[in-house]
Amino acid sequence: MGKITVETCEIEGLKVITPTVFGDARGYFMETYNYNDFKEAGIDQVFVQDNQSASVKNVLRGLHFQINYPKDKLVRVVEGEVFDVAVDLRPGSRTYGKWFGVTLSAENKKQFFIPKNFAHGFVVLSDYAEFVYKCTDFYHPNDEGGLKFDDPDIGIDWPVASKEDLIMSDKDTKWGGIKEYTASRNQ
């Protein structure tokens, strides 16, 4: 291996990946994804869709998931800085409802692997950020799910000065909490 360093997280399945960066007077080079290296690190997924978004400071996107078509994600930032969060929604998981967050930036070049059945979201910390992610399933617009970003039962510690300064889509302001989600899944 050697081209990537993989850190396991407190929540099983989540992984923070740091690539090896080769730099000189011209700039730098790194592999952002190599199937063999990722497979050796225990990330043996086939990605079928890449997405990219651009956002300004204080934009919060999330917490999102697909209900019937869950997908793994490999996320990174190519410009700026975000605080990226995953919430465990795996049925029967000992860490169900727990969250983990990591700062991703163009500077630290870290990537975050998020397995199926996690809610995902991020907030932009820099003036501007471009966010890139690979997915193991396609987007299904009629299969969207979400959780309230500030649900006290999850307790995410978003590194923002004020919730009032956040910029969110109308849809993201209307998601319910994890108790409502859990009750709806148990019916």
Task: Report the location of each language-model feature.
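Short beta-strand His + acidic residue motifs that chelate non-heme Fe in jelly-roll/DSBH
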Residues: 112, 120-125, 133
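Non-catalytic, conserved peripheral segments adjacent to functional cores
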Residues: 1-107, 126-128, 135-187
